Curated annotation (Swiss-Prot):
Isomerase listed as a keyword: no
One CC-aspect GO term: TAT protein transport complex
Residue ranges of the region described as Disordered: 41-88
Bias-annotated ranges (Basic and acidic residues): 76-88
Organism for this UniProt entry: Yersinia pestis
Full protein name: Sec-independent protein translocase protein TatA
Superkingdom of origin: Bacteria
UniProt xrefs under NCBIfam families: tatAE (TIGR01411)
Gene behind this protein: tatA
């Protein structure tokens, strides 16, 4: 008594076609298909993104290393200036 049979589904389908018309249902179906296709494409693009981020991370690490190497000579120069002030 709680389940819907094939006869009830057929009656519901006929009522929907009569209410909306075949053109409206065709447009609705194509819009739904395009939405699903766009969603799948977006999910596929998302899975391809992480490998490019890994490359950027390795470049960032090299960049940080070069910055620390450049800052070390500046720190040594400041130490020598402060050492000269203490002696002088």
């Amino acid at each position: 008594m709680g389940s819907i049979g094939w006869a009830q589904l057929l009656i519901i389908a006929v009522i929907v076609v009569l209410l909306f018309g075949t053109n409206k249902l065709r447009t609705l179906g194509s819009d739904l298909g395009a939405s699903i296709k766009g969603f799948k494409k977006a999910m596929g693009d998302d899975s391809q993104t992480p490998p490019t981020n890994v490359d950027k991370t390795s470049n960032d690490a090299d960049f940080a290393k070069s910055i620390t190497e450049k800052q070390q000579p500046v720190a040594k120069a400041e130490e020598s200036k402060s050492h000269e002030k203490e002696q002088g």
